């Protein structure tokens, strides 16, 4: 379904498509479960190959959000920007990692170490951050000061499973 919708967006004129945080499956950080580490992948890896080929086929810039396995015991929540030719233009590792009820990300992810550097692409200079980074204005400020023309935040936040139906409908 994801590829179908990416193709649809490209057909309708999208030059940049941003996927949600940790898009390869459901957001899994509501619990601490060691079996989830099996979902992590290297960068480059299977997702960057698959979606890189799709970006090249469609001539779009594509922003992925992946559970990165950098080394044994070292994992990140990483956004990867794929250029129109399918190559990796750059990546950003989520810096601010929540540890709140239903957001046990510190169990899974190490804070990023790449700094706040915009990524140059054919659609502009992208300031790519991830989800909870939006609550820390210095991240956006640093990206803007370094020339980001657009801020992008892949996110999985929607509503809490414990919210009332009235709140979800709001």
Features from the language model and the residues they span:
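Cys-nucleophile CN-hydrolase/nitrilase-fold catalytic domain and related Cys-dependent amidase chemistry
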Residues: 3-84, 91, 157-170
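Active-site catalytic loop in hydrolytic enzyme cores
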Residues: 41, 53, 70-170
